[in-house]
Amino acid sequence: MAIEFTKYHGLGNDFILIDNRSSSLPVLTPEQAIQLCDRHFGIGADGVIFALPGENGTDYTMRIFNSDGSEPEMCGNGIRCLAGFLADLEGQSRNKDSYRIHTLGGVMTPQLLSDGLVKVDMGLPRLLAGEIPTTLAPVEEKVISVPLEVAGKTWEVTCVNMGNPHCITFVEDVAAIELESIGPKFEHHPAFPQRINTEFIQVVRRDYLKMRVWERGAGITLACGTGACASLVAGVLTGKCDRTATVELPGGPLQIEWSEIDQRVYMTGPAERVFTGKL
């Protein structure tokens, strides 16, 4: 049976989207996802996203297989792409501008804006060491500006869970970071039992951050939505930035807000369809 797909990207963080609404289980295996994500012998992508039936009163369920076959809890750029994909699937029958989507990282609510961007209520950041998880602090304590030894250097790190785990460190110049060599050392550090996404952040102004990311299970990517959210939260916690800022990634900018009113994090950015096909 042929499986139709649509390729989307959010600031260059690219995904293969599958209409999986007829089954509560993904129609592809992690091994098949690895093959499809291969940029030389497959379609090429950072991950495969499945649109499944909703759970617990939600509209849909999102599951993701990374390019290495692992399954993350959530993906910020991915959920924006999923919102655009769902709007395409529903077509003329669509009667709403937002969706409640069940993910392994909690319920997320993307909203399709009139200018073509997608705004996502990413929920409350989780800050306790046990919620990351990490052994850098007791389970009921926050991990803010804690020293971490990686590759013979001491890095000051702050940890935030935005549906998936992030370790953020602030640097003078993100362009100078040798991401390909240092990224895996953070990801597989024993302080992070479930591995970790790592963001290197340069504060240009209090409302403008530059970011590079090493994603758990995907490596270097052009953008990471949950990482941008986690980085702004880390910047606020360490007094380095405002609660609303532009986060500039290699693939382009995201607008991030950590609301003082409801303490939830909101992300706004693009989701662009690239092409469709059949497997």
Curated annotation (Swiss-Prot):
Catalytic reaction list: (2S,6S)-2,6-diaminopimelate = meso-2,6-diaminopimelate
Pfam family, one: DAP_epimerase
Residues the record marks as site: Could be important to modulate the pK values of the two catalytic cysteine residues: H166, E215
Record localization: Cytoplasm
Binding site for substrate: N13, N66, G76, N77, N164, N197, E215, R216, G225, T226
Known pathway: Amino-acid biosynthesis; L-lysine biosynthesis via DAP pathway; DL-2,6-diaminopimelate from LL-2,6-diaminopimelate: step 1/1
Keywords per UniProt: Amino-acid biosynthesis, Cytoplasm, Isomerase, Lysine biosynthesis
Keyword Ribonucleoprotein tagged: no
Family (UniProt): Belongs to the diaminopimelate epimerase family.
Task performed by this protein: Catalyzes the stereoinversion of LL-2,6-diaminopimelate (L,L-DAP) to meso-diaminopimelate (meso-DAP), a precursor of L-lysine and an essential component of the bacterial peptidoglycan.
Protein name (record): Diaminopimelate epimerase
Organism: Nostoc punctiforme (strain ATCC 29133 / PCC 73102)
